[in-house]
């Protein structure tokens, strides 16, 4: 049979849900997927059908959602978030994934998005399509039985706690307001639409034979959602902690460490989380897992580089940047901003598009990528300036998976 790539009709969605159920271990059903569909633009999905007419089968699918991503400088960019990408096991190694990505990238570029983003199910797939890992997921597990806070850690006095134990569904408005403040100031922050708040709070309820009920710790400038692990009754897993201030972060952790019926508290956070340094024994906050988080593809190099902010301390400098399959540009950085224009001048620094995606939020250093020969320049001073200019003074974090 002949395969065809096109936009899906309503008749295709049952087949797409079947392919999702077979492809994604965390797929929880059509009802949740239908809610996420509200974030997909009119031309934001493609399918590959095997055959024609009513009997044709969906053997490939991909879509993008209309998202808003915070980047350094407290700038928020329209972002195309790729998701729901799958190829049937019966049709692998036929170029379907490449064809779907190429078509979606064409539509994303035509719609004017400066960047595209995704969460990768496998680490070796999306680099060849121009995506680079731009944030890092970092799991810390704390043995709370022996944890003690430094005397100079915030909130160490004898006054009453500023944190309350609450039920998540009863405090949605406060969570939304805190999250909105957080996501605008943190590179990697994403606007969370109402349908995703609906889903998050629905997941806080206990599921028969599944997850236990979630509880919340609420501070005026932060919150934490946690539940006891399904199989380990001495482990509390924090599913989300958002703090707008250092005081709120410490206050929430004081409350979590106070869960006396637990032995351990785990959280998936970011590599610069100050939690270990709040404790007198940093070893009690162990790194138990680490993985790439958000991946970025720079769709429009000048627009993306001119949109974000840069470190003021670097001073003004200029270079010529060549991005494989992306163009060659005169890049001038100064006073916290960049000017990026096409040029025919000889390149002084070269990289693939995925490398620029990894650099963009500031989580990864140009010098580190140069040491792996992923970024190439003969000018060591330029490399140091790029390190300093692209660095974010606010730690890069991962908002949520999509």
Swiss-Prot record:
EC category name: transferase
Subcellular localization(s) per the UniProt record: Secreted; Host cytoplasmic vesicle, Host phagosome; Extracellular vesicle, Bacterial extracellular vesicle; Host extracellular space
The protein's Enzyme Commission number: 2.3.1.-
Keyword Mitochondrion: no
Reactions catalysed according to its record: L-lysyl-[protein] + acetyl-CoA = N(6)-acetyl-L-lysyl-[protein] + CoA + H(+)
One Pfam family, short name: SCP2_2
Keywords, in A-Z order: Acyltransferase, Host cytoplasmic vesicle, Secreted, Transferase
Binding site for acetyl-CoA: 85-87, 93-98, 121-122
Domain N-acetyltransferase: residue ranges: 3-154
Main location: secreted
Acyltransferase found in the keyword field: yes
MF GO annotations: aminoglycoside N-acetyltransferase activity; protein-lysine-acetyltransferase activity
GO biological process terms, semicolon-separated: aminoglycoside antibiotic catabolic process
Residue positions of the active site: 126, 402
Function: Effector that is released into the host cell and affects host immune responses. Acts as an acetyltransferase that acetylates lysine residues of host proteins.
Subunit structure and binding partners: Homohexamer; trimer of dimers.
Family: Belongs to the acetyltransferase Eis family.
Stored PANTHER family: N-ACETYLTRANSFERASE EIS
HAMAP family in the cross-refs: Eis (MF_01812)
UniProt name for this protein: N-acetyltransferase Eis
Native source organism of the sequence: Mycobacterium bovis (strain ATCC BAA-935 / AF2122/97)
Encoding gene (name): eis
């Amino acid at each position: 049979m002949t395969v065809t790539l096109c936009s899906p009709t309503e008749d295709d969605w049952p087949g797409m849900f079947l392919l999702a159920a077979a492809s994604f271990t965390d797929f929880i059903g059509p009802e949740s997927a239908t809610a996420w569909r509200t974030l997909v633009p009119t031309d934001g999905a493609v399918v590959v059908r095997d055959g024609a007419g009513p009997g044709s089968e969906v053997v490939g699918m991909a879509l993008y959602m209309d998202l808003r991503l915070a980047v350094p400088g407290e700038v928020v960019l329209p972002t195309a978030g790729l998701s729901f990408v799958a190829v049937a096991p019966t049709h692998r190694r036929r170029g379907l994934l490449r064809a779907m990505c190429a078509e979606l990238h064409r539509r994303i570029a035509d719609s004017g998005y400066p960047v595209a983003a995704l969460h990768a199910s496998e680490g070796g797939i999306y680099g060849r399509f121009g995506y680079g890992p731009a944030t890092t997921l970092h799991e810390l597990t704390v043995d709370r039985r022996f944890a003690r806070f430094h005397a100079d850690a915030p909130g160490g006095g004898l006054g009453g706690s500023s944190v309350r134990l609450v039920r998540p569904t009863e405090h949605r408005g406060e969570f939304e307001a805190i999250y909105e403040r957080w996501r605008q100031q943190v590179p990697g922050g994403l606007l969370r639409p109402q349908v995703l708040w609906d889903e998050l709070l629905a997941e806080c309820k206990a599921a028969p034979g599944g997850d236990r009920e979630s509880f919340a710790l609420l501070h005026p400038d932060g919150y934490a959602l946690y539940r006891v692990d399904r199989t380990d009754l001495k482990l509390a897993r924090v599913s989300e902690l958002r703090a707008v201030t250092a005081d709120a972060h410490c206050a929430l952790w004081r409350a979590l460490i106070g869960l006396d019926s637990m032995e351990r508290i785990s959280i998936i956070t970011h590599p610069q989380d100050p939690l270990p340094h709040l404790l007198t024994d940093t070893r009690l906050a162990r790194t138990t897992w680490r993985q790439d988080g958000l991946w970025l593809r720079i769709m429009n190099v000048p627009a993306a580089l001119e949109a974000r902010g840069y470190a003021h301390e670097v001073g003004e400098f200029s270079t010529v940047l060549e991005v494989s399959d992306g163009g060659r540009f005169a890049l001038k950085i100064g006073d916290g901003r960049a000017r990026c224009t096409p040029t025919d001048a000889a390149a002084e620094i070269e990289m693939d598009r995925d490398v620029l995606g990894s650099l963009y939020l500031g989580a990864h250093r140009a010098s580190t990528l140069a040491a792996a020969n992923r970024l190439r320049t003969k000018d060591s001073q330029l490399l140091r300036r790029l390190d300093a200019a692209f660095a974010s003074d606010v730690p890069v974090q991962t908002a949520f998976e999509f």
